[in-house]
Amino acid sequence: MNIVQNPATPLSPELIARFRAIVGDKYAVTEPADVAPYVSEERGLFHGHSPLVLRPGSTTEVAAICKLATRERIALVPQGGNTGLVGGQTPHHGEVVVSTRRLDKIRDIDPASNTMTCESGVVLQIAQQKAAEVDRLFPLSLGAEGSCTIGGNLSTNAGGTGALAFGVAREMALGLEVVLADGRILNALSKLKKDNTGYDLRNLFIGAEGTLGIITAASLRLFPKPRAIETAFVGLKSPADALKLLSISQSEAAGSLTSFELLADIAVDFSVRHGIGIRAPLTGRHPWFVLMELSSSRDDARTTLEAILGLGLEQGIVDDAVVAANLSQRQAFWKLRDEMSAAQKPEGGSIKHDISVPVAAVPAFIAEANAAVVKLIPGARPVPFGHLGDGNIHYNVSQPVGGNASDFLARWHEVNAVVFEIVLRMGGSISAEHGIGVLKRDELPEVKDKVAIELMRSIKTLLDPLGIMNPGKVL
């Protein structure tokens, strides 16, 4: 998907040299072959262009870049791991890309305070590992955790599979360091859980997708590392039964239920067929599956999980289930889940939605959306899966078997209209955790409160009066 709108003025060689002097020749990328990985995302859906990619190694260098960009009115696109799914990290109009990947230092870990301060280019998986080294847990977990960065996670307010128990990225950030459009540095790297000294500026930048400033560091909340983690893969008949199992799990497990993923059979089938080394956890076929996990500081997690599954069997909710016998099997369950998005690619065109509805409405949403999409495009294959525990469903639709991918993807907005109408009628959101970017930018004013949009525009004008920070994204 190429975005044609407001092309940027080409950079002069003299201006490129001034930017290059800030980061050093080694970290200023201009050769087209070297720039290429920064201007396209892994699905090939968005393709941009940029004359220059800057890879600063410090907050001071980021500030110098922003000062020069403001002085010369040069647009910037902040980019972390380039794993975003809505085109927010792509330079669509020839902007300068500011890659944060070299901002990769862990500045401080304080297990007594349960905090970690790290730079925005730290890969999520590294942050998890560093927390584990001091017997702590950083619970944000995503399929892209091996390549996505903390800055990107915060800029999109990522959710992930642990949001049921620990919340989304916003709730894991205690403080931020942010470079503003004019190069000023906001130092709000507080480790405090209680701080009522004025406006909460931190939350302006979380979920703003780099349109208000560039996050360069964050103070993150850590949690005690669980002593026991137990995981089950469950086969059942319907999302309604999954909802009943969720209710049982929440009653029996209290706060130890950390993940509860709903998976359609077609999503599981795609992962098994197209993933590397992935096997179906259950021998029989089932219309729906649940991947659930309990984490506890005590040793009774397995007993609790088995009791939940036993109640599900007694009530006719659970048809079959397997509890992971070891870490390897647990990882295999999660690999199947994590590969679901990538496994849709070999099936042709895929129209993706990241929606949320009230938890109780999930079964009705899936049933109504499936019927509406198939009516619109006969043969289309809905592939719903996601976080039932918080109502966030990745409602993806694969093209009909044997269909033409380009023709199918050309109907993206038609499918959006059908799906979003149902979402909004049920009191939901068109973007649960992936952000707005350019993919949902044009729909945002239609679904967001008008006063909220006005306030967002006012904040953007105040913090970025020249509009140089990730232009054309979100608003």
Task: Please give the residue ranges for each predicted region.
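Noncatalytic alpha-helical scaffold of FAD-dependent oxidoreductases
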Residues: 1-475
